[in-house]
Amino acid sequence: MKKRALVSVSDKTGVVEFVKGLLEQGIEVISTGGTKKLLEENGLQVIGISEVTGFPEIMDGRVKTLHPNIHGGLLAVRDNETHVAQMNELGMEPIDFVVVNLYPFKETIAKPDVTFADAIENIDIGGPTMIRSAAKNHKFVSVIVDPVDYDIVLAELKENGEVKEETKRKLAAKVFRHTAAYDALISNYLTEQMGEESPETLTVTFEKKQDLRYGENPHQKATFYKAPFAVTSSVAYAEQLHGKELSYNNINDADAALSIVKEFTEPAVVAVKHMNPCGVGVGTDIHEAYTRAYEADPVSIFGGIIAANREIDKATAEKLHEIFLEIIIAPSFSKEALEVLQSKKNLRLLTVNIEKATSASKKLTSVQGGLLVQEEDTLSLDESTISIPTKREPSEQEWKDLKLAWKVVKHVKSNAIVLAKDDMTIGVGAGQMNRVGSAKIAITQAGEKAQGSALASDAFFPMPDTLEEAAKAGITAIIQPGGSIRDEDSIKVADTYGIAMVFTGVRHFKH
């Protein structure tokens, strides 16, 4: 008996050549709608679906393959005598290949002007049903949903006259991944349309971007996946202009640097090591901002990741070229800057849009046996809700330094303390188990620069010991959430030393 293939695709990439290859192998081809028309226009002889079902395509194509003659031909177990007898009795013929990809639901809902009706109309019903049937019966049916697999199938047919069992299994597994991702997109779209924030089940789908050489350490395997919709202001959708492939740690660090630099509207440069900022500077232009970020910590910046929120010009590129860096990420690079930086063959250069995340963005964190989902911490300082409990208010320059430190501290691993002065960070204390420990690290790093600087704390002071350390170092202004039962103790210490202190009412823990 002649083998038969059913071909019905929304993505027409390579389908004409593939069907031609099937026909050359003596395989009959059944097709539908637009696919049939395309194949016939290219001189290929195919059988219309209605000839197999004995029933016309109806309801604007909504019902065409949902028929026993199709699904019987797909699901029949060929070495089961009862199945074979029933097929013969009912005049059914087996279908050995299914070549189907689904209505472009993802592409439809990505359109800015998409209507709900358009989205619903692009939910495929017959396609998923067919490919699931074929995949369930993959011992006898080869099912292809991805044009990248056309050449593999044709090569095996030419070499062996059939598709290998292992290949059929791989293709079947891809089908169920494909339909799972497709259904996840639909369920997530409808959930969002209904405004449900915490559904009883959560299905997420990501697309493989690349295999990584290894993970956080060489003994760990790792892969990089991207969200199905382009998040243009992200490392996942950044364009790499130059350099080696990104590593697992590179991606984490670049993501951290990008998150921080998005906080600033004025020209800003951020240097990151191990997902914590080691230097942040702002200026009237990107060269001045980089100079300050470098001077913030000229030791730690070595081997770091740089993010800028303005184009990298030649003058800045020449300064960047002087030290070893892993990555530079920016909205763009001037032609002259690229010429300078591309002389370092391993330096990775990425371009990306710099857009601040919205509160609608979700952050996913895996834990053993579960997944935590929360809104991104996108809250900015609201000067209308702050309070100043101390006798002295910050000066104009202190306010500038406090705002810079506050923007940075929420991106530092808790317990977090950041010192800022004259448009740059001068000390960062990260990840200590007590707040005063982080303060001591930041103060030590700042050295004499701590005199007259501003301090930001990601959470309140449980006791005034951090304030005592700040006063000893000559820090003159502090910004913190407030809310401790010992706030009055901290206020008294601040007043004793003439420190201006701001309460934001907002905590910025980062774990």
Swiss-Prot record:
Gene Ontology BP, a term: 'de novo' IMP biosynthetic process
Catalyzed reactions per annotation: (6R)-10-formyltetrahydrofolate + 5-amino-1-(5-phospho-beta-D-ribosyl)imidazole-4-carboxamide = 5-formamido-1-(5-phospho-D-ribosyl)imidazole-4-carboxamide + (6S)-5,6,7,8-tetrahydrofolate; IMP + H2O = 5-formamido-1-(5-phospho-D-ribosyl)imidazole-4-carboxamide
Domain MGS-like positions: 1-145
Database matches in SMART domains: AICARFT_IMPCHas, MGS
Coiled coil (UniProt feature): none
Family recorded in the similarity comment: Belongs to the PurH family.
Protein name: Bifunctional purine biosynthesis protein PurH
Lineage summary: Bacteria, Bacillati, Bacillota, Bacilli, Bacillales
Gene: purH
